[in-house]
Amino acid sequence: MALRLDDKKAVVAEVAAVAARAHSAVAAEYRGLSVSALTQLRKEARESGVYLRVVKNTLARKAVEGTGFECMQDGLVGPLILAFSLEDPGSAARVVSAFAKTNDKLVVKLVAVGGKQYGPSELERLASLPNREQAISMLMGTMKAPIEKFVRTLAEPHAKFVRTLAAVRDQKQAA
């Protein structure tokens, strides 16, 4: 079904708005995937806060123009599905990577983060990035560790004294 000019402008505007606020993007070839598989991929993407859309390549090129994903323009060839991470940089990569493990017909072609394009080999690296909550908990653990060690160091002489008294008491009771 051919799109009218107004529809094309609306698609370009929608994808451009999403691309402008996205952290990262993944373009994958979906040739040979069944409708049910694509529906499952869309469901997983929705649950993860990932914008997933099949867009004509010419419209996608116009949509990413002037955004941080302009670097992807040359690689937008063939039947591609675009995934944009809206919540954290690795969410689109996690969704596409997990789905590609079970469906070999979904082939990652491009990965873009921070205005730079990477090859498909970088998908796993991006997918392994922690999300916001995980990053905060890792940071808090790192910040908390020196304080805990300091408190244990301060408490150790008192604990050692108590253990010594207990050993003397046990020795006297045994005698």
From Swiss-Prot:
InterPro entries cross-referenced by the UniProt entry: Ribosomal_uL10, Ribosomal_uL10-like_sf, Ribosomal_uL10_bac, Ribosomal_uL10_bac_type, Ribosomal_uL10_CS_bac
Q: What GO CC annotations are associated with the protein?
A: large ribosomal subunit
Q: Give this protein's Gene Ontology molecular function annotations.
A: large ribosomal subunit rRNA binding; structural constituent of ribosome
Key word Signal present: no
Q: Which GO terms describe its biological process?
A: translation
Q: Name one Pfam family in it.
A: Ribosomal_L10
| UniProt KW keywords | Ribonucleoprotein, Ribosomal protein, RNA-binding, rRNA-binding
Cytoplasm as a keyword of this entry, yes or no, is: no
- What is the top-level taxon of the source organism? Bacteria
Similarity annotation: Belongs to the universal ribosomal protein uL10 family.
So what does this one do? Answer: Forms part of the ribosomal stalk, playing a central role in the interaction of the ribosome with GTP-bound translation factors.
Subunit (UniProt) = Part of the ribosomal stalk of the 50S ribosomal subunit. The N-terminus interacts with L11 and the large rRNA to form the base of the stalk. The C-terminus forms an elongated spine to which L12 dimers bind in a sequential fashion forming a multimeric L10(L12)X complex.
Q: What is this protein's record name? A: Large ribosomal subunit protein uL10
Which organism is the protein's source? Methylococcus capsulatus (strain ATCC 33009 / NCIMB 11132 / Bath)
